[in-house]
Regions:
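N-terminal binding-site loop/beta-alpha segment at the start of enzyme catalytic domains
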Residues: 1-78
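Conserved, mostly hydrophobic/aromatic
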Residues: 6, 18, 36, 51, ...
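Acidic (Asp/Glu)-rich catalytic clusters
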Residues: 8-10, 68-75, 118-122, 149-152, ...
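N-terminal small/glycine-rich loop or linker at the start of catalytic domains
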Residues: 9-27, 80-100, 128
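Short, acidic/polar
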Residues: 30-43, 103-121, 168-177
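Alpha-helix N-cap and loop-to-helix initiation/capping positions
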Residues: 31-35, 65, 98-109, 136-143, ...
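Active-site groove signature of glycoside hydrolases
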Residues: 118-137
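Beta/alpha (TIM)-barrel catalytic core signal, keyed to glycine-rich beta->alpha loops juxtaposed to Asp/Glu
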Residues: 134-319, 323, 333-346
């Protein structure tokens, strides 16, 4: 495993981290507590030190899993979590889907959520607190950012940032927040197949002269870039991918075939997908979706595989600019996200 340090901080993270999204939400299949903790222990043994949770993942479950998995290793791991969704009052309304629930970014709610997360994590500090899917209103809410500074001064939070996704959007929220605020970290979707709006976030930080670095989620385009899907692939009903249109699967397979040149005897396509991300020094860490031990080992070894060449990078850029030679309707991205009215009612 290799490590990177966020600029102007003492926050060092493994280049491949462990996102608890897959083992705590039920959207990637169901895991027993024992199965989830076993994967986390294996990740730690493989050198992963960054564990990324959210208070809304499993209505607090992801944070509780960290506390149970690492009761005696607090100084050896980096804990990142997220606040912003009012799951205390609306968690049961979400059901199995990816439906959003109401948010509350008031200073009181953020403070309360942070204190609750600390209790679930059984720790005295959160290494990286992320505002979960902020809207434009929060970008310009000075009271919110003063609250984060207060939490930092109290020692409850070491560093803070924002986390955007899983829906692809939040372009202007992300870009404006990077420009207007001093963020240690921005977590967002980014991979060889889905480069928007992530590329815009990275460019915004560079152009604004900001030291913000990035945590990358959905590194393999919901498993597509692992290169294992076929037209016959079927997902269980509890898996969120079962709700995607069939065109997503068929067109994705066609795109992946154009990337097979990245595979070789020393590197899988899944590892190449992580190497593509790590070629950008603005990326602090990657958070692949992990749901079995074989995959965990493959991803953990990715930083030590052969890096992509400049020719590889240029070829990927060329393919992306031509949509990987696949004809399909262009995706409809939302530049500014809005919480649907029907989910905003208590």
């Amino acid at each position: 495993m290799r490590f990177r340090t966020y600029k102007n901080t003492d926050l060092t993270v493994s280049e491949v981290g462990f996102g608890l999204w897959t083992i705590s939400t039920g959207w990637w299949g169901n895991f027993t507590e024992g199965e989830a903790i076993a994967l986390m222990h294996k990740a730690f043994d493989l050198g992963m030190t960054l564990f990324d949770a959210a208070d809304t993942y499993g209505n607090g479950l992801s944070e509780e899993l960290i506390a149970k998995a690492f009761p005696n290793q607090r100084d050896e791991i980096v804990i990142a979590t997220k606040v912003g969704y009012d799951f205390v009052h609306h968690g049961e309304a979400r059901g199995r889907g990816q439906r959003e629930i109401p948010q509350d970014f008031s200073p009181e709610a953020v403070t309360r959520a942070t204190d609750a997360a600390l209790k679930r994590l059984k720790t005295d500090r959160i290494d990286l607190l992320q505002l979960h899917n902020i809207r434009m209103e929060q970008v310009y809410d000075d009271a919110l950012w003063k609250t984060l500074e207060k939490l930092k001064s109290e020692g409850k939070v070491r560093y803070y940032g924002i986390a955007l996704g899983p829906a692809i959007g939040w372009l202007y929220e992300g870009v404006n927040c990077i420009r207007e605020r001093e963020l240690t970290s921005v977590q967002h979707i980014y991979n060889m197949l889905e480069q928007h709006p992530g590329h815009a976030f990275h460019d915004a930080a560079t152009k604004a002269g900001k030291e913000t670095m990035f945590l990358i989620r959905v590194t393999h385009s919901s498993g597509m870039l692992e290169g294992k899907y076929t037209p016959e692939t079927k997902f269980p009903p509890t898996d969120h991918r079962s709700h995607r249109p069939r065109s997503w699967l068929l067109n994705g397979i066609k795109k992946v075939e154009q990337l097979r040149f990245l595979e070789n005897a020393e590197r899988t396509l899944g590892q190449a997908a992580l190497q593509w991300l790590l070629a950008d020094d603005r990326v602090a860490s990657t958070l692949p979706n992990i749901y079995d031990e074989q995959q965990l080992v493959e991803f953990a070894k990715a930083p030590d595989t052969v890096p992509l060449t400049s020719d590889d990078m240029a070829k990927i850029e060329e393919l992306y600019s031509d949509n990987f030679c696949v004809e399909e309707e262009p995706p409809k991205f939302k530049g500014t996200m809005e919480l649907p009215q029907e989910t905003a009612v208590a």
